[in-house]
Design a protein with these regions (language model features):
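Hydrophobic alpha-helical membrane segments
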Residues: 1-235
Length: 235
C-alpha cells in the first residue's frame, strides 16, 4: 500500500483522494484513532461542558474557537503518520507527536492566525470567511513539512489550494457533513444505551472520535497530493 500510495501522489482526483484516505483510515484505524484521541477527548468533554454551562461566553469559547485552535494538532500528526507510510515506515503515536511538538509553537500560531483571519472574514462578510477557511486548508501541513511560519505558511497554503480550490472545498464539505450524518444514529443508539448522567460524556467522546481516523486521513492525502502536484508543476 505504501508504494502504491506514494506512486499515485500528484495524480489523484477528488474521488481518489477520498478513497485513498478511507482506505488508509481503515487499514491504520486503531493507530490513527490513538493519535486523534489526544485532541478528540478534551474537545468532546469541552463540548459537553459548554452545553451544560449557563455562561454563553464560556459555551462559545469551548466550541468553535477551541476546536479551530487545537484540532489541527491531530491533523498534522496524521500527516506525519501518512508520510511515514509512504516511506515504508510503520506510523506510531510517538513518532507523529515528536514531530508535531518540535513545531508546536508554529502550529498553534498558524492555527490562531487562521482562526482570526476566518473570523474577521465572516464578520466582514460570510464569503471572505469561507474563502479564507478553504485557502488555509494546507497551512498546518506546510508548517510541519516545509518549516514555514505565520503569514508565509498561509501564503504557501493558498499557493497549493488555488489551482484546485473547488476540489478542496468539495472535500472539506464532505469531511464536515458526512460524519455528522452518520453520527446521528450512532448518537441515538448510545444515548438510549448509556442514558444520561455520565453516559453523556462517553457518548460525546465516541461520537466525536469514531470518524477522526478517516477524516484526518482524507485531509492528509489531499494535502500531500496537492503538494506533489505543486512540485511536479515546478511552482
Amino acid at each position: 500500500m505504501s508504494s502504491e500510495f506514494a506512486g499515485k501522489l500528484g495524480n489523484l482526483g477528488i474521488n481518489e483522494q477520498i478513497n485513498m484516505g478511507l482506505r488508509l483510515g481503515a487499514r491504520y484505524y486503531l493507530g490513527f484513532l490513538l493519535i486523534s484521541l489526544i485532541v478528540d477527548i478534551p474537545l468532546a468533554l469541552a463540548g459537553v461542558m459548554g452545553d451544560k454551562s449557563s455562561s454563553s461566553i464560556l459555551s462559545f469559547f469551548l466550541g468553535i474557537p477551541l476546536i479551530a485552535l487545537i484540532n489541527p494538532i491531530s491533523k498534522v500528526a496524521i500527516i506525519i503518520a501518512i508520510i511515514d507510510i509512504t516511506n515504508g515506515v510503520k506510523p506510531t503515536f510517538r513518532r507523529a507527536y515528536s514531530v508535531v511538538f518540535s513545531r508546536f509553537g508554529a502550529v498553534i500560531a498558524a492555527s490562531a492566525l487562521w482562526l482570526i483571519s476566518v473570523a474577521v472574514g465572516v464578520l466582514v462578510l460570510v464569503i471572505p470567511g469561507l474563502f479564507l477557511l478553504i485557502a488555509g486548508q494546507c497551512i498546518m501541513g506546510v508548517v510541519v513539512t516545509e518549516n514555514l511560519k505565520g503569514v508565509a505558511a498561509f501564503r504557501r497554503s493558498w499557493e497549493l489550494v488555488k489551482p484546485k480550490f473547488w476540489s478542496v472545498l468539495t472535500i472539506f464539505l464532505f469531511v464536515e457533513i458526512t460524519p455528522g450524518l452518520l453520527s446521528a444514529p450512532i448518537s441515538l443508539l448510545l444515548s438510549n444505551f448509556l442514558g444520561g448522567g455520565n453516559g453523556v460524556w462517553i457518548t460525546a467522546i465516541i461520537e466525536r472520535a469514531w470518524s477522526s481516523p478517516f477524516v484526518y486521513a482524507i485531509l492528509a492525502v489531499m494535502f500531500l497530493d496537492l503538494q506533489a502536484k505543486n512540485k511536479e508543476s515546478g511552482s
